[in-house]
Amino acid sequence: MSDKDRIAQLLRELEEAKARVEEAKAREAQERCEKERLQLEHRKTTFLEYLRNCHRHLYNALRLTDTSRSSTGYTKVVGKYYPKRLRPWTNFANVLHPRYFDLVQKICGQRQLFEPASTTKNLGTIISDHLAGNEKAIDRFEVDAVERPVQAILKVLATHEEAGKAYRCPEFRFSANLRELTQEDDGSSGADDNTSDGSLERRQQAGPNKRPTSKRKYICSNRQPDGVGIRMQPGGGQTQAFIYDYKAAHKVAIEHVRSATAKEHLFHEVVARINDNKLSRDKEVQRREQAEAFIAMALTQVFDYMITYGVSYGYVAAGRCLLLLYVDRDDWQTLYCHPCLPADDVGEPTNDWTDRLSHTAVAQLVSFCLSSFQSEALEGQSLETALSVANATLKTWSESYADVAYLGLEPAELSSAPSSQNTDISEYTSKAKPTGRNVALRSQSSCKPAAVLPQGNEHDEHDEDHSEPGASRSRLAANKRKRGPSSGGEDEDIAMADPEPTRQYCTQACLLGLKRGKDLDENCPNVSLHRFDGSSRHPVNAHRFTDMVKQQLLLSPYKGCRMVDFWGKRGAMGWLFKLELFPYGYTFVGKGTLEDRLSRLEHEGRVYARLDHLQGDVVPVHLGLVRLDRGYILPGLEFVVYMMLMSWAGQTPSASMADAETLKRESLTAIWSEGVDHGDDNRANYLWNAERCRIMIIDFDRARLFPPLKPRAVSRLSKPKRERGNRSRHQIRT
């Protein structure tokens, strides 16, 4: 080989070596990039990264069915409050949202606090696999794509001490769908003292500790939104911060949202069109009018919930948009609305769209939640006072506000069309008189005859509302008459508010002594108020006590009476109240329920009578049943009418209480020996009482009565009892 050829070969080999080196470098760079990508995909994300991922992979994953295959029907709003005016919520857009977005961004900074991008992508894949054509599908989407991320961000704020205090960021959760706010129910009411021989025999053979776990359904108001934002208070209570409702995406058409919500008299126009049964001949105008009607009805439904649940904040979630709502309690007739349309506001993703992340659904709903935390929900007397004002100033669908001029179409564009005509508006035009409103709230001169929605079966899946708003508002009006005339307004009513119970609960020994006619309990924290004329005896007997409580609540259901926790202390048939009898200072609890559940309270009273000699030790002291003439108002415009009076049993045992199950079995055996099968194994029904150093059992509305067991049978069921002297060391959860 010549020198020339050898040189050429060496040059080729050198080039090949260089190429191999370059390939190796490129391969290493690619592997490094892939490794970094995987690390980025699987590491936790920053606040802004999380917003970007939620919008890109979750919000954009929503796929809607063709409208022809979507659920049909209207939102049921007849008899519900609706506002006179609709105005832009500019304070949220210009002040509140920028402030809270900057706050969250400052607190989170560049810390990697949120789920990895891979997790968000995987969830987005699941979302995109399902077409959304009805409210149930929107429900699932909103939970996964919006509510879950919002809750994750608020959880970070709640753990930030400075922000938690300054901006009132509590522990928070979106409620489950209130129509499904249940534990499973086996369908047994428990109100019958008798049971079949076979069932009774099986229960007696099994004993008190071997029956199947009870499944119970929790009571909910008939006026139920799809969800409630629940905030947990430091003391353990729970209050509502806002109300929300889901709507199928085609019910809140995004192409009409901005124009519809910009109309100050939207509600008046829609109500007038429906009442007059006027249709435009123009098909395009018909579609716009139908879209406006659906939007107005969706807003009305949430507005009514906001009023009756005592909150100033609410929103409509419809997949492609959120309608964020606010009501100023100084102006009930105006609803403020901020339409959130992320697809338009954020736009298509680019390499750097950080400046638009504040417009994502998650970011805006976080700011909405923080805004709502600054406002307290109305409850009890303040709620009734506010609802009396609302009842006097607001109209209900389909009544008209007399002083609003109808800004409708020109006569040439309108035609009077029968509701049987095959047009869009016929779906929500009246054919019949409204049902459920049998008492007028206002004079007939102020109310125009109203067209209403048909009472057929063409309703939304989740819009079934079996309440009778007329009946509830009639009670509200009657309550105001019973209070008598007031020379002032709402502020005066609040200033004259009835005193709430403030004292510690009386002891079991105190209230048992009252019931049995024995001496005062010197260990009761309220004994100084019980003692009259230096006597060691109770100043009243049990019968007089119950009568005095009845008379006190007859004057006002809020005098010395306060609901303990509407969301946390609700059971299968009622709510817990704290009461104080003036001037004797007796402080105890009441189990309140609605008018149609009296039989279950009476059944529970019979169970307590069977357990008479166990009262104050194994079960609370039962002090009778009273009726509240006016009723204690609840969120959702329900009224507690009956109340069973009892001693306070205690608190839920802490997780560290090792012998809780043993103590529970002892108490169950004790009531079983008296012929009572508790029938409800819910953990909340077994409370640690530090005074008696044992587990006390409550809630006997599902209990079954049977003949008491003979002593020999009792001894077989009983186990050796342990000394209770050292049980006071157990901690309770406060």
From Swiss-Prot:
Q: List, alphabetically, the GO terms of the cellular component aspect.
A: cytoplasm; nucleus
Where is this protein found? Cytoplasm; Nucleus
Q: What happens when the gene is disrupted?
A: Sensitises spores to SPOK1 encoded poison.
Coiled-coil intervals: 4-41
The alphabetized UniProt keywords are: Coiled coil, Cytoplasm, Nucleus, Toxin
GO BP annotations of the record are: meiotic drive
State the disulfide connectivity.
none
Region: Disordered, residue numbers: 180-222, 414-499
Record's InterPro entries? Kinase-like_dom_sf
Query: Where is the sequence biased in composition, kind Polar residues?
Result: 416-429
Instruction: Please list the residue ranges that the record marks as compositionally biased, kind Basic and acidic residues.
Output: 457-468
In its UniProt record, a GO molecular function of this protein is: DNA nuclease activity
Q: State where it is primarily located.
A: cytoplasm
SUPFAM superfamilies from the UniProt entry? Protein kinase-like (PK-like) (SSF56112)
The job of this chain, per UniProt, is described as: Promotes unequal transmission of alleles from the parental zygote to progeny spores by acting as poison/antidote system, leading to poisoning of progeny that do not inherit the allele. May possess DNA nuclease activity that leads to spore killing, and a kinase activity that confers resistance to the nuclease activity. Can suppress meiotic drive by the P.anserina SPOK2, SPOK3 and SPOK4 proteins.
Protein name according to UniProt: Meiotic driver SPOK1
